[in-house]
Amino acid sequence: MRCSHGGALRPRGGNEGIGVRVSVIIPTHNEAQAIGRVLADLPSNLVTEVIVVDSNSTDGTPDLARKMGAQVIQEPRRGYGRACLTGLANTQNPDVVVFLDGDYSDRPSELPIILAPIIEGRADITLGSRFGGKSNPAALPWHQSFGNRLAAGLIRLLYGVKVSDLGPFRAGRADVLRALALEEATYGWAVEMIVKGAIAGFRIVEVSVSYYPRIGKSKISGTVKGTVGAAWFILSRIVRYSLRRRRAGTPRPA
């Protein structure tokens, strides 16, 4: 895969820890039970800003996030991808953008693992794989695990990206994310980032992260029916981008 950037990111006074500006985006919908723990566990010396994008929560999630110091943006329109895009549009000139769920299934304390390949200049996009770290087997039901592996296998086959999972804990250089012109408003957004990144020749690196049972009920994949629907949608998106890849290129940063 062609390398789009060379060398590590240059420090520019972003924070005390690494000198790089890091924005963390957390989509939420009724995550009052978990959001406090998520925000408390983020390494404050590595993070420049935290943006919680809330979609019509009725349990006080936005107020809790504000009390913890996060910037809260209300996004009434539904869609996981839409929430991520809204957060991205409201970042304040970051070098790196991290995406993290608000249910405490991922461990925010593992942020250094996600950031390292980008900070060190080895990657443009980093994906957290839930299949190689210290994960609780009960966190991913068999149908969700199977669907993720199937989609990841199709991406490997069609695009040559060494990926084993489509997990939500991920990061990207801000200039790369802007260049990809992401637009998917649903949970297909996770696939869009990988596929467009691969087509453009950006360096995509996967790292192992921990994964535990979420706090609260899953909005998408808690049932076999929900997982099948999500998997079918994601697989169709993977194939669609493959069919379109010869018609138009994806812009790259200068």
Predicted regions and their residues:
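Catalytic donor-sugar/metal-binding loop of nucleotide-sugar-dependent glycosyltransferases
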Residues: V161, A185, V195-Y212
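Cell-envelope/extracellular polymer assembly enzymes that use nucleotide-activated donors
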Residues: R21-S23, E49, E192
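Short, well-formed alpha-helical segments that are part of the catalytic scaffolds
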Residues: N30-S44
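Acceptor/aglycone-binding surface of glycosyltransferases and processive sugar-polymer synthases
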Residues: P76-R78, R82-N90, P108-Y187, P213-A230, ...
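Donor nucleotide-sugar binding loop of glycosyltransferases
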Residues: E31-A34, S57, Y80, R107
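A conserved acidic beta->alpha catalytic loop
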Residues: D54-P62
